[in-house]
């Protein structure tokens, strides 16, 4: 029950953040064909966590862990005896990981551009890792509705086929990106599959 109350409370906080102008990673749109895009992303910094379980289980647990970090379970760099709240950004991204222990996923939040890796508060939870992501090319497909496993599989296959028709090389795993709070109606939701690519 306490977990449910926490998630509802966080959902309202997230909804408030998303009602205002919320920051997203900076990218340049290089190509657009219907729902497909090729983007060149600038470098950004993330907070991430690796979690076990099904997609839904891992999403809930990973979300809670990183949200706990940005809401203040951390140590400020400038004042180590104090914590620091970090603004919510979008999207929240999940990526499948290889694990001998069963299903595993890596979830990350992009940190606001006002921070650099060296200036981010230190997590109190060792499961939270901070790292920089370099610039790179990503193919993307946008869709609404719920991010069910079948929807993710269908959109990923569509995007992979588009990449193949362009003659690009896939350089990493597909990422599921979600941009909305839990209270957004399914038909208004913005979801994306992102796949890192390399042009010949």
PLM features: what roles do these ranges have?
Residues 3-6, 12-200:
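A solvent-exposed interaction/effector surface
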């Amino acid at each position: 029950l306490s977990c449910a109350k926490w998630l509802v409370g966080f959902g309202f906080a997230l909804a408030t953040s998303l009602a205002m102008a919320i920051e997203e990673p900076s990218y340049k749109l290089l190509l657009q064909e219907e729902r497909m895009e090729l983007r060149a992303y600038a470098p950004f910094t993330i907070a991430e966590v690796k979690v076990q379980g099904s997609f839904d289980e891992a999403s809930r647990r990973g979300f809670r862990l990183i949200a706990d970090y940005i809401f203040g379970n951390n140590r400020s760099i400038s004042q180590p005896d104090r914590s620091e709240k970090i603004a919510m950004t979008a999207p929240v991204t999940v990526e499948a990981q290889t694990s001998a222990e069963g299903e595993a996923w890596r979830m990350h939040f992009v940190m606001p551009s006002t921070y650099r890796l060296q200036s981010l508060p230190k997590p109190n939870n060792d499961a939270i890792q901070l790292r920089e992501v370099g610039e790179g090319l990503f193919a993307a497909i946008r869709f609404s509705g719920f991010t069910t496993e079948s929807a993710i599989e269908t959109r990923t296959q569509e995007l992979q086929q588009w990449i193949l028709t362009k003659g690009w090389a896939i350089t990493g795993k597909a990422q599921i990106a979600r941009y909305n709070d839990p209270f957004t109606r399914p038909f208004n939701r913005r979801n994306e599959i992102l796949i890192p690519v390399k042009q010949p």
